[in-house]
């Protein structure tokens, strides 16, 4: 099965997302998918809170005249803005945009709050819905008209040095987040022609999907003083002088959820990282005539024991065990524990790992400790697999001074190996003309094993 078919199929079968809503590019998070989203963004919120970011919530509606202040930035998506033009039947004097992003709303308010250097740094974030009138082919959780999970952080600083340090913190924070949800990535400095409009520069996280295409899953932008000058974000320095603040912004969206689903899935279904799994352990009673009560009493006891540390479900549906195995493999539940009369007689239980399919017999008397060990191994294995997956999709090609020869070499590597092609960095081919020659996207300048490369790939 092709990846795109698998992806659409698994969103439905695993109860992740329903795209049958009657607006293109808008869908519904189903309960199981929403829990994956919730646990994932809890990790992200924790990382932000621990680094002194404050969560807030700004309005969704933006007056047209305020949005227009973004100038160069708004040109990047002015054709994608949704507009509210009426209040009931009454035309509005000023059109209102549905939030495509929040620079204008946040920076308008920051101007009210930032007066002196002691008000800095200011580090705010929110998790909100944003709207883009995507005209390209929409894809669930990947390319949406209503992005339902947009985490955007915006910071303001007194000095360029503090601003640069914030970029480093944001990159480390995002790296830790993607490591936690077992999504592999490379980090690139986007080329000038592909940076965030209005930014000094953009750093981006890209992951690789099973079909060899890359997906941008996070961005970090150094805005310098560009937006501050537009929005008159001035403050009084310790010397009593006036200066503009230095700013950063960085975002992660539903693509993080799409990626943790896509990267580790297999022909059986999802393989979910433990920390974001809605159900971490499923218990399956193996019932035999005359032994039902013994088995159910024991497995209910096990349920109570494990629930002290894990999210556990006891599947007591009146269907065959094989059907239950299939259902929970599709949903990617990390561990399955089976318990039948013979297991009880022997003082044992059978644990099955979703990531490897390995079946492990453990002593029932020590089951909590055994489960903790296996969960730890599961987590480590998924992280190792994540690293392997992206390394297997990286290909380094030798540099050629002849641009046409180099482009043919890159195209051949993309055709043969797919994934990300790394070219030793050289300014002579770091341009849009070369991007057109190779019929792929230049991700940017990437450091790999201590060397600088131009990274190129076919992208979503």
UniProtKB/Swiss-Prot annotation:
Entry's EC annotation: 6.1.1.15
Record's subcellular location: Cytoplasm
Keywords carried by this UniProt record: Aminoacyl-tRNA synthetase, ATP-binding, Cytoplasm, Ligase, Nucleotide-binding, Protein biosynthesis
Reaction(s) the record says it catalyses: tRNA(Pro) + L-proline + ATP = L-prolyl-tRNA(Pro) + AMP + diphosphate
Main subcellular location of this protein, as a coarse class: cytoplasm
Uppermost EC category: ligase
Lineage: superkingdom: Archaea
GO molecular function terms listed in the Swiss-Prot or TrEMBL record: ATP binding; proline-tRNA ligase activity
Family recorded in the similarity comment: Belongs to the class-II aminoacyl-tRNA synthetase family. ProS type 3 subfamily.
Function (record text): Catalyzes the attachment of proline to tRNA(Pro) in a two-step reaction: proline is first activated by ATP to form Pro-AMP and then transferred to the acceptor end of tRNA(Pro).
Name the UniProt record assigns to this protein: Proline--tRNA ligase
Organism per entry: Methanococcus maripaludis (strain C6 / ATCC BAA-1332)
């Amino acid at each position: 099965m092709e990846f795109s078919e698998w992806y659409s199929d698994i969103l439905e079968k695993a109860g992740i997302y329903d795209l049958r809503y009657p607006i293109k590019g808008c869908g519904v998070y189903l309960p199981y998918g929403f829990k994956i989203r919730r646990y994932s963004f809890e990790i992200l919120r924790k990382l932000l809170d621990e680094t002194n970011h404050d969560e807030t919530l700004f309005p969704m509606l933006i007056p047209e005249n305020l949005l227009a202040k973004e100038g160069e930035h708004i040109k990047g998506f002015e054709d994608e803005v949704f507009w509210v033009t009426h209040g009931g039947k009454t035309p509005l004097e000023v059109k209102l945009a549905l939030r495509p992003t929040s620079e204008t709303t946040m920076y308008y308010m920051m101007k009210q709050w930032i007066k002196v250097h002691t008000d800095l740094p200011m580090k705010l974030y929110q998790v909100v819905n944003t709207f883009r009138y995507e005209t390209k082919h929409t894809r669930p959780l990947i390319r949406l008209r209503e992005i339902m999970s947009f985490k955007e952080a915006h910071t303001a600083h007194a000095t360029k040095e503090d601003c640069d340090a914030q970029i480093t913190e944001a990159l480390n924070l995002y790296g830790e987040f993607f490591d936690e949800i077992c999504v592999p990535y490379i980090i690139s400095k986007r080329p000038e022609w592909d940076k965030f409009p209005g930014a000094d520069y953009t750093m981006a996280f890209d992951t690789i999907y099973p079909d060899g295409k890359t997906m941008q899953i996070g961005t970090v932008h150094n805005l310098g003083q560009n937006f501050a000058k537009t929005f008159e974000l001035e403050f009084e320095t310790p010397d009593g002088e006036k200066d503009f603040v230095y700013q950063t912004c960085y975002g992660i969206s539903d693509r993080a959820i799409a990626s943790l689903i896509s990267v580790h899935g297999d022909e059986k279904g999802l393989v979910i990282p433990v920390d974001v799994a809605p159900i971490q352990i499923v218990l399956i009673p193996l019932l035999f005539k005359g032994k039902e009560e013994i088995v159910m009493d024991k497995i209910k006891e096990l349920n109570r024991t494990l629930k002290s540390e894990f999210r556990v479900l006891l599947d007591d549906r009146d269907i065959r065990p094989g059907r239950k195995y299939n259902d929970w493999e599709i949903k990617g539940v990390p561990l399955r524990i089976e318990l039948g009369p013979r297991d009880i007689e022997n003082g044992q239980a059978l644990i099955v790992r979703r990531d490897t399919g390995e079946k492990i017999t453990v002593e029932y008397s020590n089951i909590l400790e055994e489960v903790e060990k296996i969960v730890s191994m599961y987590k480590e294995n998924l992280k190792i697999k994540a690293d392997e997956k992206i390394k297997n999709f990286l290909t380094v090609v030798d540099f050629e001074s002849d641009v046409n020869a180099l482009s043919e070499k890159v195209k051949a590597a993309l055709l043969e190996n797919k994934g990300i092609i790394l070219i030793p960095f050289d300014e002579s081919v770091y341009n849009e003309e070369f991007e057109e020659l190779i019929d792929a996207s230049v991700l940017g300048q990437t450091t790999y094993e201590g060397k600088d490369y131009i990274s190129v790939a076919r992208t979503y």
